[in-house]
Amino acid sequence: MTLIHMNVLMAFSMSLVGLLMYRSHLMSALLCLEGMMLSLFVLAALTILNSHFTLANMMPIILLVFAAYVAAIGLALLVMVSNTYGTDYVQSLNLLQC
């Protein structure tokens, strides 16, 4: 395993740890999820470049498109929650509190 692959896997694991530690705010959870998607994109692109598998060249681009789509939905959810509740705490999204 090369040093670049180790760095990308470390970035993914740091984003995962950040998601587990800072899950009280919706904005920090979205940022950690975006970091995970970016590291997956880089890992997929590096793997395809190293293996010379030309049939899978579209996979990182499709992953990036889905990441942008999920980020747009997450930001729309963040705006809706902050306008409705006045805060971005994940605890305010609990439907059982009513």
Curated annotation (Swiss-Prot):
Coiled coil: none
Reactions accelerated catalytically: a ubiquinone + NADH + 5 H(+)(in) = a ubiquinol + NAD(+) + 4 H(+)(out)
GO CC aspect terms: mitochondrial inner membrane; respiratory chain complex I
Keyword Cell cycle: no
Documented EC number(s): 7.1.1.2
UniProt-annotated location(s): Mitochondrion inner membrane
Entry's transmembrane regions: 1-21, 29-49, 61-81
Annotated membrane topology: Multi-pass membrane protein
Reported function: Core subunit of the mitochondrial membrane respiratory chain NADH dehydrogenase (Complex I) which catalyzes electron transfer from NADH through the respiratory chain, using ubiquinone as an electron acceptor. Part of the enzyme membrane arm which is embedded in the lipid bilayer and involved in proton translocation.
Listed PANTHER family: NADH-UBIQUINONE OXIDOREDUCTASE CHAIN 4L, NADH-UBIQUINONE OXIDOREDUCTASE SUBUNIT ND4L
Family affiliation: Belongs to the complex I subunit 4L family.
Protein name: NADH-ubiquinone oxidoreductase chain 4L
Organism lineage string: Eukaryota, Metazoa, Chordata, Craniata, Vertebrata
Gene: MT-ND4L
